C-alpha cells in the first residue's frame, strides 16, 4: 500500500510541474510568420496620440516616414518604382497609424491590422520594449518596400534597432550635458520656449521622453533575462520531480532528493515572482503613456496628462493571463513539494542521535567540579 501512495504523491507533483512548464509555451509565441501564426501576447499596444507633445511627435514621425518611403522608392531600391501604385499610402511605412496593433511577447511580436496578422518576428534579446518594436517595424517595412532586398527585411530591422539604441544613448548624454550649459544647443535645435505660454519647456519635455525611453530599454533587457532564467528553472524543476519519483520507487526515506525538491521549487517561485512584479511595473509604466479621459463639470479640458508623452493605448494580453495562472500553479507546487519532502525525508538514525546526545552531555569530571 505504501508504494501506490508514494506513486500518487509523485504523480501529483509531476502533473503540476509539467502543467506549469507547458504554460511557458505561450511566452515563446509571436516569433514566426511561417505557417500558423500563433501569438499569446503579454501586452497589446496601439499608437494613438494624446498630449500636444505626443501629437506633434507622432505627426512629425509620420511625415518623416513618408519621406523615407518615397526616398526608398525613388532611389532605385525598388524594382517597381515605375508603378504609380507604390506611392499610395497603404504601401508606405504605416507604423504610427492608429489602426495598427502590436502584440508584444518576451521573444518577439506580431503586427495586426483589421484583426488579421500582418507578420510576426523575433525581437532578439530586446524583450518587450515598445519603442524598439516600433523602430524594428519601420526597418522591416523599409525592407519590404525595397523589393530588391526583400529577403533582408530582418537585417533592416536589426540594423535600425541598433542605430536607435546608439542614437538614444547619444541624445540622452547630449541633453544631460547641455542642461549644465543653460540648454543653449537644445534651444538652437528645438527652439526657445514662448515666455507668454505657461508650462514645461520643450527641452525638458524632450529630456523627459529620452530618459523614459532609456529606462524602458534597460528595464526590458532585465525582464527578458528574468523570463529566460525562469523557463530554465521551470525545466530543472521537472527533472528534480522526476528524480524524486525515481527515488521514491526505490525507498521511502531519502535525504538528498527532498532537499533538492524544496530548493528547486523555492527558486522557481522566487524568480517567477520577480518576473510577475516586473511585468506589473512595466504595465503601470505603459499606462502612464496612455491618455486618460476625465470628465470634469465646467471644465473644457478633459484630458489629464502625467508625462507629456501620452501616445499609446495599452491592453493586457492572453499571455499575461496565462502567466498568472502558471504562477498560481507554481505556488501550489511549492506547498505540496514542501509537504512531500518533509514527509519522505530520512530521519536521523538512533546511533547518530545517541552520538549527538553523548557529545552534548557534560562529562562526569566536569560534573564533579
Swiss-Prot record:
Keyword Transmembrane: yes
GO terms, biological process: ascospore-type prospore membrane formation; spore membrane bending pathway
Cytoplasmic side: 1-6, 242-265, 341-369
Keyword Membrane: yes
Keywords: Endoplasmic reticulum, Membrane, Sporulation, Transmembrane, Transmembrane helix
Ranges per topology, Lumenal: 28-220, 287-319
Compartment(s) where it occurs, according to its Swiss-Prot or TrEMBL record: Prospore membrane; Endoplasmic reticulum
Native species: Saccharomyces cerevisiae (strain ATCC 204508 / S288c) (Baker's yeast)
A Gene Ontology term for the protein's cellular component: cytoplasm
Stretches the record annotates as Disordered: 348-369
Family membership noted in the UniProt record: Belongs to the SMA2 family.
Residue ranges of the TM segments: 7-27, 221-241, 266-286, 320-340
UniProt protein name: Spore membrane assembly protein 2
Topology with respect to the bilayer: Multi-pass membrane protein
Classification of source organism: Eukaryota, Fungi, Dikarya, Ascomycota, Saccharomycotina
Role according to the record: Involved in spore and ascus formation. Required for the efficient assembly of the precursors of the prospore membrane to a continuous prospore membrane.
